């Protein structure tokens, strides 16, 4: 049978089906007692090859329940690149902490699978199930250090609050179904032209459930404790890629499907954006632990990113996608540096450039990019979001965001000042591994090169 004649058009989901099989094999590989390096590099090689073939699978699957178009494929490539870097970062940590490789790698792959399905979903039940596949895998990853109390506490807290947010989102889907008699987004678009309070309630609950995962204030309380308690590579993973998937899917649903309710959801998101930028930046100022500082920093960045969704145009949404790509590189890179330095106290970063100049330069680049200092890529994507907001008439919101960006410079550049302008108080013992060095190099080159030559970022 020709592949184009497969019932329900499953060929568009062949990449996801292949990834499911590979992740299952990695999970079973523990029985074969393969070398850890074999598991890691075979996974990386698989994902690299996987990325080359993904653009070949455009179209619909399962009668329109999933859609692969240019934007979806772009989001999937970001997820794959982030997953590759996360696997490389995870490797050195697993070696150091003696954690089982096959389980950690498999659950990262299953989580990435959920994210890829999420950005393709064009039906609310498929959206929810993809969301849960991503979430359940992450809960396991957060608690992968089985005998670490902080890791276990973080996993339980994340699981309990995550389950609560999923219930709220599912309740919202039920309201939308009750008002439209369908869960297919294409059909919902046809029947929501008349203003319906039931749809508005459902949409509000749906947004609240998703806001939990991207840590928008006031749904952020889990983030600092979970980010601090989780293994550092897992923190890097969950602080970036789930946001790519959720904002990619969530932003598109709002902009394309619920356009008639733009005033309602945009006003709600404006309040959340301002509260998120304020809370994230002000709490980051007082942190002494770099993982908690980066946790609050990621909350603040969620506030900036949402501005692109608030714009409500395709160009605004495109700026969100570009921001998420660069945010993935610079945030995973920053957490990779925390692993490399093997030190979480900000005080102990003093004078690092004297003993580890290459690592200090990489950290400087990531801090500059997170701040939005030119010519880093972080400046380009933040400027692009602000530009789209100004064009849409949200100049006042951009002014507020710029003020908070200036505030953020204090805690980011404090790290740089400590590394270059303070005398060392403690000599860290960096963790060196081939995989970690490759990950840091990829992130550093990406953030620097795409800042000088933005290419597709604008």
From Swiss-Prot:
<keyword id="KW-0520">NAD</keyword>
<feature type="transmembrane region" description="Helical">
    <location>
        <begin position="393"/>
        <end position="413"/>
    </location>
</feature>
<feature type="transmembrane region" description="Helical">
    <location>
        <begin position="12"/>
        <end position="32"/>
    </location>
</feature>
<keyword id="KW-0813">Transport</keyword>
<feature type="transmembrane region" description="Helical">
    <location>
        <begin position="293"/>
        <end position="313"/>
    </location>
</feature>
<dbReference type="InterPro" id="IPR001750">
    <property type="entry name" value="ND/Mrp_TM"/>
</dbReference>
<feature type="transmembrane region" description="Helical">
    <location>
        <begin position="159"/>
        <end position="179"/>
    </location>
</feature>
<keyword id="KW-1278">Translocase</keyword>
<comment type="function">
    <text>NDH-1 shuttles electrons from NADH, via FMN and iron-sulfur (Fe-S) centers, to quinones in the respiratory chain. The immediate electron acceptor for the enzyme in this species is believed to be ubiquinone. Couples the redox reaction to proton translocation (for every two electrons transferred, four hydrogen ions are translocated across the cytoplasmic membrane), and thus conserves the redox energy in a proton gradient.</text>
</comment>
<dbReference type="GO" id="GO:0050136">
    <property type="term" value="F:NADH:ubiquinone reductase (non-electrogenic) activity"/>
</dbReference>
<feature type="transmembrane region" description="Helical">
    <location>
        <begin position="321"/>
        <end position="341"/>
    </location>
</feature>
<keyword id="KW-1003">Cell membrane</keyword>
<keyword id="KW-0472">Membrane</keyword>
<feature type="transmembrane region" description="Helical">
    <location>
        <begin position="199"/>
        <end position="219"/>
    </location>
</feature>
<feature type="transmembrane region" description="Helical">
    <location>
        <begin position="37"/>
        <end position="57"/>
    </location>
</feature>
<dbReference type="GO" id="GO:0048038">
    <property type="term" value="F:quinone binding"/>
</dbReference>
<dbReference type="Pfam" id="PF00361">
    <property type="entry name" value="Proton_antipo_M"/>
</dbReference>
<keyword id="KW-0997">Cell inner membrane</keyword>
<keyword id="KW-1133">Transmembrane helix</keyword>
<dbReference type="InterPro" id="IPR010096">
    <property type="entry name" value="NADH-Q_OxRdtase_suN/2"/>
</dbReference>
<protein>
    <recommendedName>
        <fullName>NADH-quinone oxidoreductase subunit N 1</fullName>
        <ecNumber>7.1.1.-</ecNumber>
    </recommendedName>
</protein>
<dbReference type="GO" id="GO:0042773">
    <property type="term" value="P:ATP synthesis coupled electron transport"/>
</dbReference>
<feature type="transmembrane region" description="Helical">
    <location>
        <begin position="361"/>
        <end position="381"/>
    </location>
</feature>
<comment type="subunit">
    <text>NDH-1 is composed of 14 different subunits. Subunits NuoA, H, J, K, L, M, N constitute the membrane sector of the complex.</text>
</comment>
<keyword id="KW-0830">Ubiquinone</keyword>
<keyword id="KW-0874">Quinone</keyword>
<feature type="transmembrane region" description="Helical">
    <location>
        <begin position="230"/>
        <end position="250"/>
    </location>
</feature>
<feature type="transmembrane region" description="Helical">
    <location>
        <begin position="124"/>
        <end position="144"/>
    </location>
</feature>
<feature type="transmembrane region" description="Helical">
    <location>
        <begin position="70"/>
        <end position="90"/>
    </location>
</feature>
<feature type="transmembrane region" description="Helical">
    <location>
        <begin position="266"/>
        <end position="286"/>
    </location>
</feature>
<dbReference type="GO" id="GO:0008137">
    <property type="term" value="F:NADH dehydrogenase (ubiquinone) activity"/>
</dbReference>
<dbReference type="GO" id="GO:0005886">
    <property type="term" value="C:plasma membrane"/>
</dbReference>
<keyword id="KW-0812">Transmembrane</keyword>
<feature type="transmembrane region" description="Helical">
    <location>
        <begin position="101"/>
        <end position="121"/>
    </location>
</feature>
<feature type="transmembrane region" description="Helical">
    <location>
        <begin position="438"/>
        <end position="458"/>
    </location>
</feature>
<comment type="similarity">
    <text>Belongs to the complex I subunit 2 family.</text>
</comment>
